Amino acid sequence: MIPTIAILSGGFSCEREISLMSGKAVKKALDSLSYNAIEIDVDSNIAEKLKKINPGLAFIALHGPYGEDGCIQGLLEILGIKYTHSGVMASAVAINKVMSKHIFRSLNIDTPKGYVISREDVLKNNIKIDYPYVLKPINEGSSIGVYIIFSHEDYLELKNNSSTIMEKMIVEEYIPGIELHTAVLLDEAIGTIEVRPKNKFYDYEAKYTDGFAEHIFPAKIPDNIYKMTLEHALKIHQFLGCKTISRSDFRYNPKNNTLKMLEINTHPGFTELSLVPEIAKLAKGINFNELVKIIIEDSLQHKNIRDLSHVEQYY
């Protein structure tokens, strides 16, 4: 019997519109695969909606806080509903850039130097990192609220738009060079793509507007660096106990031959323009519909919907 699949999208975060796009793409794929799929716009009544539908699986097409930070995952576990993507712990740790950077370092994975800074210190320009630096939220995605400050003029422009500065943010060194993204699928790092944005960096517009960035696969970087992206992405995916898919983001500086890991995303963007589907297609010949089916089948076969972390291997 084919289970009913509830597609959870929308939600409360700044990434709501992206989530709705992901949800519609998944619904289209599931319809073509003849699954019984129901789209649910997540709100404060989500528990009641899920109990009424009683789906066999929840496909999480949510992004940002409440969707990929362990909140919806915890609710689904309480309700006894299987779900796609990673569990509570992996989701909560991965979205928190401070926590995840500590874990990168503990696994000997290099990451940009930085620290947590208050809104007050940003406004006073009490910043201990020289230009250029990056200012970004602790737990948002899709490059929302990310600023690259190359000069004092950039800082003044940011200060004049101070409403976008959060109470706590991360400030870290800017790594010049090449933007890299590595996909993990079913415990295999399947490939790394290079992104050359037309804007200053790979921002929201470049991520979700066709033609705003050039994608190169496989990434044109030295073989040993390419191999390192695959190794690092798989290592952190397994350490956190991520499930089915994830995407790890890196910067490579060819001038000093250094690779820095920026973050791991347990719920990467999931439209046909998104990076993980693109890598799956180019690396493995897996089209979008097939990728959706793989995620569903892998999620349904897990008897235990709780986290399966491999942390004990490193303890």
UniProtKB/Swiss-Prot annotation:
Molecular function per GO: ATP binding; D-alanine-D-alanine ligase activity; metal ion binding
Xref: PROSITE patterns: ATP_GRASP (PS50975), DALA_DALA_LIGASE_1 (PS00843)
Enzyme class: ligase
Cofactor(s) needed: Mg(2+); Mn(2+)
Protein residues bound to Mg(2+) 1: 249, 263
Major place of residence: cytoplasm
Domain called ATP-grasp: residue spans: 101-297
Subcellular location field: Cytoplasm
Enzyme Commission identifier(s): 6.3.2.4
InterPro entries: ATP-grasp, ATP_grasp_subdomain_1, D-Ala_lig_Van_CS, D_ala_D_ala, Dala_Dala_lig_C, Dala_Dala_lig_N, PreATP-grasp_dom_sf
Cofactor binding notes: Binds 2 magnesium or manganese ions per subunit.
GO biological process: cell wall organization; peptidoglycan biosynthetic process; regulation of cell shape
Binding sites annotated in the UniProt record for ATP: 128-181
Catalytic activity reported: 2 D-alanine + ATP = D-alanyl-D-alanine + ADP + phosphate + H(+)
GO cellular component, one term: cytoplasm
Residues reported to bind Mg(2+) 2: 263, 265
Matching Pfam families: Dala_Dala_lig_C, Dala_Dala_lig_N
Domain of life: Bacteria
Pathway participation: Cell wall biogenesis; peptidoglycan biosynthesis
UniProt family annotation: Belongs to the D-alanine--D-alanine ligase family.
NCBIfam families listed in its UniProt record: D_ala_D_alaTIGR, PRK01372.1
Described function: Cell wall formation.
Protein name: D-alanine--D-alanine ligase
Organism: Wolbachia pipientis wMel
Name of the gene this protein is made from: ddl
